[in-house]
Amino acid sequence: MADLEEQLSDEEKVRIAAKFITHAPPGEFNEVFNDVRLLLNNDNLLREGAAHAFAQYNLDQFTPVKIEGYEDQVLITEHGDLGNGKFLDPKNRICFKFDHLRKEATDPRPYEAENAVESWRTSVETALRAYVKEHYPNGVCTVYGKKIDGQQTIIACIESHQFQAKNFWNGRWRSEWKFTITPSTTQVVGILKIQVHYYEDGNVQLVSHKDIQDSLTVSNEVQTAKEFIKIVEAAENEYQTAISENYQTMSDTTFKALRRQLPVTRTKIDWNKILSYKIGKEMQNA
């Protein structure tokens, strides 16, 4: 082990550490970071070399953050990344600095985004917030309006998580939706992601995603937003139902085919008793 450690350069150590961090399960960033910190045993190297991994993790996970002085949380995403550690809160029309390691927002300042698409963005945001409030107990959403390749584009991001460390599981839902504002009809593109980690009696992760495409009728801002939400709701309901049914089927068939729930004797083994019997027998023979 010592020989292997001597063979690894600082660059290779940082690369491995960064990979661990970017693959940390939802809600377990701090635990993974602390473990990596112990393994690397060089705080300066970790902070400087793996800073990009901290940022990438928050961008990928749609990390929600509360800005002091503002009621609603905002998501950290690539769509709100203004560079130099600054991010956009389109609802409150501010930008702020974000510490990717501490996950803290500071220095909020006024920021004017794309005015041409703002009325569309606001309408979609209003409709999406109502939808998220109804379907996600801990949901947060952020809606962006920007020009991409000369086209006015709406990007809607949703994040909802449950971190239950005391019960040995954590999970996160993310979805991202995009459409351009074009006359008559447009294409809606979405991606839905679920990641759950269960680690009480083992170590099991569910990582799933689904790509969505649908057509959206474009009329006025309010009506278009309503039609957009119908597409989002139908797709996300279908995805959630499919995931639930699929894993129920796996539990009833695949998992049972792989392993018996009870041994051949049809009796569960009390390993604690067996261990105590063995220890007692050894003590008697001593």
Swiss-Prot record:
PROSITE patterns the UniProt entry points to: F_ACTIN_CAPPING_A_1, F_ACTIN_CAPPING_A_2
Entry keyword Ligase: no
GO MF annotation: an example: actin filament binding
Pfam families xref list: F-actin_cap_A (PF01267)
N-acetylalanine PTM sites in chain numbering: 2
Coiled coil: none
Domain of life: Eukaryota
Positions of post-translational Phosphoserine modification: 9
Biological process according to GO: actin cytoskeleton organization; barbed-end actin filament capping
Family annotation (InterPro entries): CapZ_alpha (IPR002189), CapZ_alpha/beta (IPR037282), CapZ_alpha/beta_2 (IPR042276), CapZ_alpha_1 (IPR042489), F-actin_cap_asu_CS (IPR017865)
Entry keyword set: Acetylation, Actin capping, Actin-binding, Phosphoprotein
GO cellular component: cortical cytoskeleton; F-actin capping protein complex
Quaternary structure and interacting proteins, as annotated: Component of the F-actin capping complex, composed of a heterodimer of an alpha and a beta subunit. Component of the WASH complex, composed of F-actin-capping protein subunit alpha (CAPZA1, CAPZA2 or CAPZA3), F-actin-capping protein subunit beta (CAPZB), WASHC1, WASHC2, WASHC3, WASHC4 and WASHC5. Interacts with RCSD1/CAPZIP. Directly interacts with CRACD; this interaction decreases binding to actin.
Free-text function comment from the UniProt entry: F-actin-capping proteins bind in a Ca(2+)-independent manner to the fast growing ends of actin filaments (barbed end) thereby blocking the exchange of subunits at these ends. Unlike other capping proteins (such as gelsolin and severin), these proteins do not sever actin filaments.
Family statement: Belongs to the F-actin-capping protein alpha subunit family.
Protein name: F-actin-capping protein subunit alpha-2
Gene source species: Loxodonta africana (African elephant)
Lineage: Eukaryota, Metazoa, Chordata, Craniata, Vertebrata
Gene designation per UniProt: CAPZA2
